[in-house]
Amino acid sequence: MTSDQIKQLDANYIAQTYAKFDLALSHGQGCEVWDFDGNKYLDFTSGIGVNSLGWADPDWLEAVIAQLHKLSHTSNLFYTEPSARLAKHLVQVSGLKRVFFANSGAEANEGAIKVARKYSHDKYGDTRSTIISLVNSFHGRTISTLAATGQKLFHQHFFPFTAGFEHLIANDLNAFKTRIAQNDICAIILEVVQGEGGVCSLDQAYLQAVQGLCQVQDILLIIDEVQTGIGRTGTMFAYQQFELKPDIVTLAKGLAGGLPIGAFLLADKVAETLAKGDHGSTFGANPVSCAAANAVLTKLEPLFLTEVMRKGQKLRKALQSLPHVKSISGLGLMIGVEFDEHINVADVVTNCLKQGVLFLTAKTKLRMLPPLIINDEQLERGVTVLAQVLSEM
């Protein structure tokens, strides 16, 4: 089948909800992918931060194939080894107490919202149900996670949303202090680096002050690590770089290295909030996805994470010297590049694609989420192509 035939089938039969690259992918290996016409591309997207180990990692493939030969699905009515092992591993690396497995980041955030509401209801009754999130945040596309998302762009056409969500300006501590004085807040959900919002890191002083206020007023701190988690920023979780101790952490994207999975981790304080029957998922804790996630976590040893941090610093340094670059944001291998105002980021991405390198956007910024295994030569190649494209604009 040719690229044009695939695109036509897509146009005819798939709901047209995505602004796709003009590219039909056939296969991948490491940090490179090929289209159906035989063209090769260097990948700085990793499926929007999902393919942590790149494409077709041999150990990942071995784990997935072995599990497919045993159990592909069981439901959560039965115990399975992959989910039990994965839960233990996540608890050990996070310091939290329990894990619930879902299928996506939105599902993980929905679950975290339910935990926060139930914790508050059990302890305080019906008077503390409001959840604060931040302007410019992104937490998912379900009705409740859209309500939590602090971007009006995503709110069009879908009212009414789930009640009980309010958005505050990030890094404005006085606004947070003023709002929580009403004593009706059960939780705050935030990303320490706002990915879809433009790869914007929050201030450490703000985050630590918010955490302190939450502890005083028994407000749950939910950290959305859907995009930042599982080594993306150079530590297992981005919150670890800000010296935070969240009550709930949500995960997805890179956790299973390319298969659907979501999870929320619960600290001791809320570990027993959900009782049997309070929450569930038919496909959650899928044995194949959990086996894949175990393969990913096995690779993320301290030296591997140190290399992610080093490569991120190397990439940032190289980007600083490029023409039209105004600022660079992010942590580790989650990087945003802001250009001079006359540069159209969509044109940059399109022209880089024509030169064989795939990048993403985040609002007006170029976004880089390469596989964590990317090597120095590939980083340099990507920067060289970007420099060439920018020099011609």
Swiss-Prot record:
Q: What keywords were assigned to this record?
A: Amino-acid biosynthesis, Aminotransferase, Arginine biosynthesis, Cytoplasm, Pyridoxal phosphate, Transferase
Could you tell me one molecular function GO term of this UniProt entry? pyridoxal phosphate binding
Which residues does the annotation say bind N(2)-acetyl-L-ornithine? Answer: R141, S281
Pathway terms, separated by semicolons = Amino-acid biosynthesis; L-arginine biosynthesis; N(2)-acetyl-L-ornithine from L-glutamate: step 4/4
Q: Which GO terms describe its cellular component?
A: cytoplasm
Gene Ontology terms: biological process = L-arginine biosynthetic process
Q: Which SUPFAM superfamilies match?
A: PLP-dependent transferases (SSF53383)
InterPro entries, alphabetically? AcOrn/SuccOrn_fam (IPR004636), Aminotrans_3 (IPR005814), Aminotrans_3_PPA_site (IPR049704), Class-III_PLP-dep_AT (IPR050103), PyrdxlP-dep_Trfase (IPR015424), PyrdxlP-dep_Trfase_major (IPR015421), PyrdxlP-dep_Trfase_small (IPR015422)
Tell me which residues bear N6-(pyridoxal phosphate)lysine. Answer: K253
Q: What is its EC number?
A: 2.6.1.11
* Required co-factors: pyridoxal 5'-phosphate
An example of a Pfam family matching this protein is Aminotran_3
Q: Which residues form the signal peptide?
A: none
Q: Where in the cell is it found?
A: Cytoplasm
Cofactor binding, per record: Binds 1 pyridoxal phosphate per subunit.
Which residues are listed for pyridoxal 5'-phosphate binding in this entry?
G105, A106, F138, D224, E225, V226, Q227, T282
Q: Which reaction does it catalyse?
A: N(2)-acetyl-L-ornithine + 2-oxoglutarate = N-acetyl-L-glutamate 5-semialdehyde + L-glutamate
Cytoplasm in keyword set = yes
Q: What else is known?
A: May also have succinyldiaminopimelate aminotransferase activity, thus carrying out the corresponding step in lysine biosynthesis.
Similarity field: Belongs to the class-III pyridoxal-phosphate-dependent aminotransferase family. ArgD subfamily.
Instruction: Tell me how this protein assembles.
Output: Homodimer.
The record's annotation in NCBIfam families points to: argD, PRK01278.1
Q: What is the protein's name according to its record?
A: Acetylornithine aminotransferase
Species of origin reads Haemophilus ducreyi (strain 35000HP / ATCC 700724)
User: What gene name is listed for this protein?
Assistant: argD
